Design a protein with these regions (language model features):
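P-loop/Walker A NTP-binding module and the surrounding RecA-like catalytic core of P-loop NTPases
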Residues: 110, 116-119
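Domain-level signal for Mg2+-assisted phosphodiester chemistry and nucleotide/NA-binding surfaces
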Residues: 1-90, 119
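Short, structured coil segments at secondary-structure junctions
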Residues: 59, 116, 134-136
Length: 246
């Protein structure tokens, strides 16, 4: 997804605003970018769900306890997460950050890390604010990372997947930015990067497809071809440049 492939990632989890059911998917996703050698969770241990306590033990996540003693201290865990992130950022030794939360309080943290030249991978539910999603280099909806089984009741009632055609305009616009006009070929890898650059939360899984290539093949007004073996390209068909043409 990105040209910068960090080798050592710091995973910071806002326990109060993250889903334990998605943690395995989060860790699997992070393997695409590097190693999550540092794994820290922040929250009130006494009020932390059994699912999170089990996940922290199983996934070697250090849970840092910040009790909610009064209304005035309800943000103690959030503040601790930010302090830990700044310590890691200025101490060096990490190549990127992953933040699990839906809290808009971390918007500035995300932009600050990116200003320092490091990528930020965000993870949160459908309801995560657009501001936080756009503050990340890449944002993944936790619902897209959960196994769709009865063993995970947290995903019951999840938002229905969008139809592949719902991604049409976004795909068309990205192709047009890379190659204005109709008929010009664009590499699928280049298109992938452009889609995420413009919309960090773009994910084929939101539209029911595992990969971008599968999503492209499901579009009506695109031509997809292989060149040479193992490399794919795509172009707009005549008439696809109109709104709703894909």
């Amino acid at each position: 997804m990105t040209d910068l492939i960090p080798q050592r990632l710091a995973l910071l989890i806002d326990i109060d605003n993250g889903s334990a059911a998605a943690i395995d998917g989060v860790l699997a996703e992070l393997e695409r970018y590097g190693r999550s050698d540092i794994r820290l969770g922040f929250g009130d241990y006494e009020h932390t769900s059994a699912a999170w306590r089990e996940a922290c033990i199983r996934c070697a996540i250090e849970l840092r306890h910040y009790p909610v003693l009064a209304m005035g201290s309800k943000n103690a865990a959030d503040i601790a997460l930010v302090i830990a992130a700044m310590d890691l950022l200025h101490g060096g030794g990490v190549d990127g950050f992953a933040i699990v939360s839906s809290d808009t309080d971390f918007v500035r943290l995300g932009t600050r890390i990116r200003e320092a030249g490091l990528p930020v991978y965000g993870f949160g539910p459908w309801g995560t604010s657009e501001r936080f999603r756009k503050a990340c280099t890449r944002f993944l909806f936790s619902e897209n990372l959960m196994p769709d089984t009865p063993a995970h009741p947290a995903i019951i009632g999840r938002r229905p997947l969008q139809e592949p055609r719902d991604a049409g305009n976004e795909i068309r616009d990205a192709i047009a930015r890379l190659h204005p006009g109709v008929g010009g070929w664009v590499g699928v890898e280049d298109l992938d990067r452009e889609l995420v650059r413009h919309a960090p939360d773009f994910d084929p899984r939101t539209y029911g497809k595992r990969t971008l290539l599968e999503l492209l093949k499901a579009q009506r007004r695109l031509t997809v071809s292989q060149y040479p073996v193992g490399h794919w390209r795509v172009r707009l068909m005549s008439g696809a440049s109109k709104v709703g043409g894909i």
